[in-house]
Swiss-Prot record:
Family statement: Belongs to the UPF0337 (CsbD) family.
Region (Disordered): 1-64
Record protein name field: UPF0337 protein SH2043
Leader sequence segment: none
Gene3D superfamilies the record matches: YjbJ (1.10.1470.10)
Membrane-spanning residues: none
Ranges in a coiled coil: none
Comp. bias regions, Basic and acidic residues: 22-64
One Pfam family, short name: CsbD
Top-rank taxon: Bacteria
The organism of origin for this protein: Staphylococcus haemolyticus (strain JCSC1435)
Amino acid sequence: MAEDKFEQAKGNLKETVGNVTDNKDLEKEGQNDKASGKAKEAVENVKNKANDLIDKVKGNNDNK
C-alpha cells in the first residue's frame, strides 16, 4: 500500500513540474501515475475487506 501512495506522490510531483514548465506530456504522465496509484490502492482496499469478510464468515462457521 505504501507503494501506491508513493506512485500517487510521484504522479503529483510530475504533474506539478509539467504544469510549471508547460510540459503537457509530463503533466499528463503525472495524472496517469496518480490515477494508477489510486486505482491500485482501491483494489487493495477491496481485497482487504473481502479477506476480512471471509475470515469473519469462517469464524462464524467454526462456532457451529
